[in-house]
Amino acid sequence: MAKRGMLIVLSGPSGVGKGTVRKEIFSQPGNKFHYSVSMTTREMRPGEVNGKDYYFVSKEEFEQEIAAGQMLEYAQYVDNYYGTPLKYVNEMLDSGKDVFLEIEVKGAMQVREKAPDGLFIFLTPPDLMELRQRIINRGTDDIDTINKRMKKAVDEIEMMQNYDYAVVNDEVEKAAEKIKTIIRAERWRVKRFLPDYRKQLGELN
């Protein structure tokens, strides 16, 4: 039976660059992470691809998935649902593959409760003014939505204490490399290393 894979959760406030950093990690040679595509009810942005960036569904479809217990986590953010389908994540982990989630902070806290052995990384901006400018530069939100996102961001940064590691996204390439370094180190933590040895010892007895 394959050793169970590691669940890696990257989250942070809206506009911090989670998607950009995740894409940088996945674009590098030798990448073996499996990206769990999130589901959302928000409208597709220019350049996004259904099934690659997100699964874009209606509110009714999303709520049906919730009712059926098919979401690992979900949250409602600025009037839209975001969440992670459960089936794919479990299939990948059980087959020994490492699964990479890029999700909202509220959703990450739900995953923390259900999968406490996951690796939780908080991506943070250099400062709040930089975060506001990044949201404005996206050109997808009106001023009211930008203000909502900033208020939410302040609350989310306070939740950083619930994560294992924090990475400042001042430069995408540097942030991606820091995250890869964290993951490499995490593999050798005793709590991840010891279960396999105990299993081997049990087989000898």
UniProtKB/Swiss-Prot annotation:
Its EC number is 2.7.4.8. GO terms for cellular component: cytosol. CDD domains: GMPK. Keywords: ATP-binding, Cytoplasm, Kinase, Nucleotide-binding, Transferase. It is found in: Cytoplasm. ATP binds at G12, P13, S14, G15, V16, G17, K18, G19. Essential for recycling GMP and indirectly, cGMP. Belongs to the guanylate kinase family. This is Guanylate kinase. It comes from Ligilactobacillus salivarius (strain UCC118) (Lactobacillus salivarius).
